[in-house]
Structures are given as structure tokens and as C-alpha cells.
UniProtKB/Swiss-Prot annotation:
Coiled-coil blocks: none
Protein name: Histidine--tRNA ligase
Name of the coding gene: hisS
E.C. no: 6.1.1.21
HAMAP family in the cross-refs: His_tRNA_synth
Catalysis: reaction(s): tRNA(His) + L-histidine + ATP = L-histidyl-tRNA(His) + AMP + diphosphate + H(+)
InterPro entries (UniProt xref): aa-tRNA-synth_II, aa-tRNA-synth_II/BPL/LPL, Anticodon-bd, Anticodon-bd_dom_sf, His-tRNA-ligase, HisRS-like_core, HisRS/HisZ, HisRS_anticodon
Disulfide cysteine pairs (residue numbers): none
Enzyme class: ligase
Family: Belongs to the class-II aminoacyl-tRNA synthetase family.
Compartment(s) of residence: Cytoplasm
Gene3D superfamilies per UniProt: Anticodon-binding domain, Bira Bifunctional Protein, Domain 2
Source species: Mesorhizobium japonicum (strain LMG 29417 / CECT 9101 / MAFF 303099) (Mesorhizobium loti (strain MAFF 303099))
Length: 500
């Protein structure tokens, strides 16, 4: 006897998420607002593919067998390594380099899309997420960096985040690079250790100085004690080197007095550029409550070469466990003068900012700044008779409603009237259209106000109040279908506006 074939188990891969209609609409609404600010600043839309040659991504080059962890990669028929993009910046650099001669300089563009990280997933940490970037390529001066910070502040306020609930923090990687040079971590041979330092400093808010000091030194067990949890290898700095790094990246640090960096040219250049950015944003009317200079901002990617930015939400909102916490970063960016230059062999200055779309959407929903109250479920035409003539008549009703701009559908399942009304209720449909044999013979139909009907059932117990309420169901001539539905929808909208 043949074995029964096993059913394939339906399961979502770890680190990925399905998206609901509500979330999709919320993201589209939020992104339309962000896009309007980018457009206001004169940026143009652009788009690049999800897949790039791995060497074009720059940070995760293939080894003998496969690319390093961090990206999803595969080989094509020509045995060339391809990877899903891990951000939008590296593909932008490739595009600009490939089309450099025909693009206007400065090239000001924005783009949005999915990016992928082959990293360990966790709560709120996904392997696929959406970013929304803006970039200026071809401008060497820090005026472009100052503009990025100002544009991000304007984005926050356009989304309804009031002053005091956000801040754009600005630093300069040259400050930290100068410190690293001074303590002996300059040069190509120390790229790996520098990246470990950057990622350690990027965790200051989460781990605090002592936790970061372990990552700067021998390493850290994430369980809090030796042998507990996973071990993260440190940068191998000695105590003096680690202290110099922590001193230079303290949130309120000013120009360091320590002689270890006092004469370092890279450090001094970074400090000077920060002073220029601060002067520019203040002259434009952006106070410290909106854009603040902050030495703790480093960003975790190696390719940043100058000013770096981070958009932080200061508002306290519930986390996944219901605890009230400061939400933190929702985006960041900086100057990446070396990315385009890799392809062209000549200096090409560039700066940009990336918004974490999913994270920002979560924050806005928690703050009550994003909802879909203006999205109304469709009017549903119930199917009482299933012969071809009746189906054609129901379809005609739907067509009339759609022609009038009313979102609507004909029920296409196989259930009876009771189940159809239950379907309409689960969809949140505002109105149901009903026409059986008796109504058809009279040229009439019933229009059921599902919102008012639900309210009356839940709230009204007094007969007098019931009679005084708006009718939850009316019978009208077929010719009055559109007018009556519009009337009901308008009444529902008025009640929503009153907060009823």
C-alpha cells in the first residue's frame, strides 16, 4: 500500500515577516509624507535592483568558497557571485559610477526598497527590512551634510513628531579615525579591528561604557558572565587605548585635551567640520533641540568617511514586553566619499541618509501619529440568487458603485446570507446591499448600514432611543442605490469625525 504523501508544513522563515493590509497602507502613507519632503528639497526618485554583483557591494567580498556572512549570496551560471543588497547606498554608488558622465553633478536622488541581512534574527531584528534613502553625490563641502541633517529634522516634523520628541545627532568619523590613528589602529591592515571598534561604540546606548569597553578589549559574553550566552570577540585594545576611544566618543565630549590626539590632523579636521555644520544649521534656524552635535554617534559601517548622522526618537513608548522605554534610532547616514571612488579611481564626494521604514512606522503607530482611519472597507453586494441573470444584476450594482468612486465588491464565496453578513462584518464593511426575489420583483433593494446596526445592538436598550436612532436598514428603488449609499457613508464619516 502506497504511503500517503506528507503535507508540506506552512512556516515562515526565521527573521522574516508577513505584512498585513493595515501595515502596507500605513507604510505607504508614511512614505508619501517622507517623499514629499525629499521632493521639496529638490531630490529626484531613482531605483536600483535588489541583486548586485557581490564585489560591487564592497563590504562583504567573496572568499574561496562563498561570500562572508552578512549577505545572502549565490553564484550565477558564469560562477560570478551575486548578493541581495544589504543597504541602498552601495547600489547607488555602483549606479552613479556606471552612469557618471550623463548624470548632473551634484546628483540628488532618493530611493526606497527592501534590503537583506544574513544575520542572527531576534525580537525586532529582521533579515528583510525596508529603507528610504536620500543621497547627494558630487558635493565635497559639509554644506551638503548640514542639509541632510536639516532635511531629516523636517521629515520628523512632517510626520507629526513634535520638537522635543526627536533629535538629529551629528558627529564626524574623522574624530574617531583620528583617535584610532593616534593609538596605532590606522592603515589598511587594521580595517577589521577598526570595524569592531565602530560596532562596539554603536552599542553604547544598549550596553553602556562598561559593556562597550569589553567589546573594545578582549570580548564580551552576552549572558553577562563568562561562559553565559554567545561570545562576541573584541577589538583587542589595551586599557589605555579603550579609554581613549571611550573618552572621544562620550555623548557630551568636547575637543579632547589628551595629547594622544591633540596634534592629529584627521582629528582636528573632523572637529573643524563639525563646527562648520553646527554654524550652518544654526544659521538656518535649527536649534540644538532639533540638531545636536554628539560625539557618541559613529554608525556601524566602515565606508563612512566624514560627518555621520542619526535620527533618534526621544519619546518614551511601550516595547514588545510592555515596558516604557525611549524608542531610539529610526535612521542614520553620513558621508561616504570612497564608495563611488572605488569604481572610478578618482575622488567622488557623497553623503546620504537612510530611514528605517519598518522601525519608524512602529514608532509612529505607538505615538498615535499613523492610522488608516481614512481607509474604508468595501461596500459588499450580497448574492441571494446564483443564476446567471441574477449574478449579472449584482455585478451591475457593483459597477454603478465603482463608477461613482465607491469601493465595492460582489460576494464571490459560496455561503448563504448569514455567512455573507458575517464575512462583511469581519471585513469591516460599512454597507451591505441585499436584493432577493421579492425586492427584484418590485425593482427595489435593501441597503443595510452595518456600522449603525452594530452600534445599535451594542449600545441601545431603550425602545424610544432605538426608534430615534438612524435607520440601520432601508429599502430603496434600484435607481437610488448610489445616492443612498453615499448618504450612509457620509453619515458614517461625520460620526467618525465627531469621535463617536
Amino acid at each position: 500500500m502506497a504511503d500517503k504523501s506528507e503535507k508540506t508544513k506552512a512556516r515562515l522563515p526565521r527573521g522574516f515577516a508577513d505584512r498585513s493590509a493595515e501595515d502596507i497602507r500605513a507604510v505607504e502613507k508614511m512614505m508619501a509624507t517622507i517623499r514629499s519632503v525629499y521632493e521639496l528639497y529638490g531630490f529626484e526618485p531613482a531605483d536600483q535592483p535588489l541583486i548586485e554583483y557581490t564585489d560591487a557591494l564592497g563590504k562583504f567580498l567573496p572568499d574561496q568558497d562563498r561570500p562572508n556572512e552578512g549577505v545572502f549570496s549565490f553564484q550565477d551560471d558564469d560562477e560570478q557571485w551575486l548578493s541581495l543588497r544589504y543597504d541602498l547606498t552601495a547600489p547607488t554608488a555602483r549606479f552613479v559610477a556606471e552612469n557618471y558622465e550623463r548624470l548632473p553633478k551634484p546628483y540628488r536622488s532618493y530611493r526606497s526598497g527592501w534590503v537583506f541581512r544574513n544575520e542572527k534574527p531576534g525580537p525586532g531584528r529582521f533579515r528583510q527590512f525596508m529603507q528610504f534613502d536620500a543621497d547627494t553625490i558630487g558635493t565635497p563641502g559639509v554644506a551638503a551634510d548640514a542639509e541632510m541633517a536639516m532635511m531629516m529634522a523636517d521629515v520628523m516634523e512632517a510626520l507629526g513628531i513634535k520638537r522635543g520628541d526627536y533629535v538629529i545627532r551629528v558627529n564626524n568619523r574623522k574624530v574617531l579615525d583620528g583617535v584610532l590613528e593616534a593609538i596605532g589602529l590606522g592603515g589598511e591592515e587594521n580595517i577589521g579591528r577598526r570595524l569592531t571598534v565602530l560596532r562596539a561604540i554603536d552599542k553604547l546606548d544598549k550596553l553602556g561604557p562598561e559593556g562597550v569597553k569589553l567589546l573594545l578589549g578582549p570580548g564580551r559574553w552576552d549572558g553577562g558572565k563568562e561562559g553565559e550566552g554567545d561570545f562576541a570577540k573584541g577589538a583587542g585594545l589595551n586599557n589605555g587605548q579603550a579609554e581613549a576611544v571611550l573618552q572621544a566618543t562620550a555623548r557630551n565630549a568636547q575637543a579632547a585635551q589628551d595629547s594622544v590626539v591633540d596634534s592629529n590632523a584627521t582629528y582636528q579636521e573632523g572637529v573643524g567640520e563639525l563646527a562648520t555644520i553646527e554654524a550652518l544649521v544654526r544659521a538656518a534656524g535649527y536649534g540644538e533641540d532639533r540638531i545636536a552635535m554628539d560625539r557618541s554617534v559613529v554608525r556601524g559601517l566602515e565606508y563612512y568617511t566624514g560627518p555621520v548622522f542619526e535620527a533618534e526618537l526621544l519619546a518614551e513608548i511601550p516595547n514588545e514586553d510592555g515596558q516604557i522605554v525611549r524608542f531610539g534610532s529610526v535612521g542614520g547616514g553620513g558621508r561616504y566619499d570612497g564608495l563611488v571612488s572605488r569604481f572610478r579611481g578618482e575622488p567622488v564626494p557623497a553623503t546620504g541618509f537612510s530611514i528605517g521604514v519598518s522601525r519608524l512606522m512602529t514608532a509612529l503607530k505607538n505615538l498615535g501619529k499613523l492610522d488608516n482611519a481614512d481607509v474604508i472597507a468595501p461596500v459588499v453586494v450580497l448574492v441571494m440568487d446564483k443564476d446567471t441573470e441574477s449574478l449579472g444584476r449584482y455585478q451591475k450594482m457593483v459597477s454603478e458603485l465603482r463608477a461613482a468612486g465607491i469601493r465595492s465588491e460582489m460576494y464571490l464565496g459560496g455561503a448563504g446570507m448569514k455567512a455573507q453578513l458575517k464575512y462583511a462584518d469581519r471585513r469591516g464593511c460599512p454597507v451591505a446591499i441585499i436584493q432577493g426575489g421579492d425586492e427584484r420583483a418590485k425593482g427595489e433593494l435593501q441597503i443595510k448600514d452595518l456600522i449603525e446596526g452594530a452600534r445599535m445592538s451594542a449600545e441601545i436598550t431603550d425602545n424610544a432611543e432605538w426608534r430615534a436612532a438612524r435607520p440601520a436598514q432601508v429599502t430603496v428603488a434600484e435607481s437610488e442605490l448610489v445616492a443612498e449609499v453615499k448618504k450612509i457613508l457620509a453619515a458614517q464619516a461625520e460620526e467618525r469625525a465627531r469621535g463617536k
